[in-house]
Amino acid sequence: MAPGCCTTRPRPIALLAHIWRHCKPLCLLLVLLLLCETVQANPDAKRLYDDLLSNYNRLIRPVSNNTDTVLVKLGLRLSQLIDLNLKDQILTTNVWLEHEWQDHKFKWDPSEYGGVTELYVPSEHIWLPDIVLYNNADGEYVVTTMTKAILHYTGKVVWTPPAIFKSSCEIDVRYFPFDQQTCFMKFGSWTYDGDQIDLKHISQKNDKDNKVEIGIDLREYYPSVEWDILGVPAERHEKYYPCCAEPYPDIFFNITLRRKTLFYTVNLIIPCVGISYLSVLVFYLPADSGEKIALCISILLSQTMFFLLISEIIPSTSLALPLLGKYLLFTMLLVGLSVVITIIILNIHYRKPSTHKMRPWIRSFFIKRLPKLLLMRVPKDLLRDLAANKINYGLKFSKTKFGQALMDEMQMNSGGSSPDSLRRMQGRVGAGGCNGMHVTTATNRFSGLVGALGGGLSTLSGYNGLPSVLSGLDDSLSDVAARKKYPFELEKAIHNVMFIQHHMQRQDEFNAEDQDWGFVAMVMDRLFLWLFMIASLVGTFVILGEAPSLYDDTKAIDVQLSDVAKQIYNLTEKKN
């Protein structure tokens, strides 16, 4: 570019800033003119507003005659059910409170005011009925958001302010968490009696019928995730107070709610039922594991934790016990009983014959009869005949190496006895008797065996607290010695053989009875397993089945009457 021609083009932003600096007063003046033009665009409404409120006194009741009654129509539009606090017994709702009444000072001819039929005025500038929530639980009895009121040329005034009310609600916890609650909101005039202000529901058709079935408008209701609305009736009452002779009318808006139980079923019911059935498995756990009592105590502590959790949810009332609380008390009783029974079973399992002798009826009932009813297989060695076992024990002993050697020696010294006599002799040896044994002398081959057995008789006779087996044998041996002269070594050997036989017999009986006690404990475990399982099933269905809502098929009306709910469910169906 040639020298002297170095002009630059202004940037767009800089150009706008330059125009704004020089034209700012002009722009502000233009905006003011537009606003003035807008205000002057409806001079009829301004003139009407001045005419209606210039001489209006908002403190005076709007009647032409002092004896007249102002009829106030009251309605409630529910927007949201925010919360129902069971602990504090407070219902929190987001509502629109609809008011309608006639004010003769607000009548005009629309033709005189350019066809204006409605006028919106601040509610602070007109008379308002002092409608309050009687059962308020938060301190705010009246509407705090002062929205504009709508004036009709006929004199009708419509005022619909929004409000969040916290009303007291008496909670019935008998069937928690399958419960239904009925709450109400009582509205009435705080100052004026029934001769000055008469209340009527906005949907009430005649004066005789004071009850309206659909008393709350649910068209703008947003469905709750915890409660279903079953009914919203409204009813007009008149109450006489001690202070005044005139009646005070009020309107009750009732809300019947049914709890959606999915949350509590998943987080409370199923864990409680599962933990209660663990008490049945205590009796399936073997007694030798050493964990039966620990499992019982763990289950008891778990149920105590759930009981404390419920006490934090429900109100502190002594009028009724909640359904879930009944079930927890029932299961805690079962678990506590299982602890006691488990201790008894463990005591039976570890009993010893030296301290506890099993009675015949215990053996007959718990070993022979009850296992068949419980479909248990009884080991064959537990069904033995103890008397036959004692008789045959000598024959078993004679078949051992030592017993056979003793019998051979007796046969040699008896001069070749017959087989029948030998069998009789074996039986007598097994039974502990020595009478009638025709033994003449002992040989040198038996002397070593006798010497081996001759020493420890005195020490073994009192082993394990068993009675001496030698009592009664001295007389029989003396009789034998009187008839036949036996060597002293053979007599001593017979004494020791009899002791060993009786000691082994008592030891086997000791072990067998120890096994019997263990099997009795096992049978008791199986018996109480079935009893506790049946009790748990019956208790679960009986206690939890008391709730009437489980059999109530009433459909919720909030989904049917709410336009918002219909839109939500329609969108959900389209997405699916």
Swiss-Prot record:
Subcellular location: Postsynaptic cell membrane; Cell membrane
Free-text tissue specificity from the UniProt record: CNS in embryos.
Pfam families named among the record's database cross-references: Neur_chan_LBD, Neur_chan_memb
Glycosylation sites: 65, 254, 570
Keyword Plastid: no
UniProt superkingdom: Eukaryota
One GO-annotated biological process of the protein: chemical synaptic transmission
SUPFAM superfamilies the record matches: Neurotransmitter-gated ion-channel transmembrane pore (SSF90112), Nicotinic receptor ligand binding domain-like (SSF63712)
Extracellular side: 22-261
Topology of this chain in the membrane: Multi-pass membrane protein
Signal peptide positions on this chain: 1-21
GO molecular function, one term: excitatory extracellular ligand-gated monoatomic ion channel activity
InterPro entries assigned to the protein according to its UniProt record, in alphabetical order: Neur_chan_lig-bd, Neur_chan_lig-bd_sf, Neur_channel, Neuro-gated_channel_TM_sf, Neuro_actylchol_rec, Neurotrans-gated_channel_TM, Neurotransmitter_ion_chnl_CS, Nicotinic_acetylcholine_rcpt
Disulphide connectivity of cysteines: 169-183, 243-244
Key words of the record: Cell membrane, Disulfide bond, Glycoprotein, Ion channel, Ion transport, Ligand-gated ion channel, Membrane, Postsynaptic cell membrane, Receptor, Signal, Synapse, Transmembrane, Transmembrane helix, Transport
Protein name: Acetylcholine receptor subunit alpha-like 2
Lineage: Eukaryota, Metazoa, Ecdysozoa, Arthropoda, Hexapoda
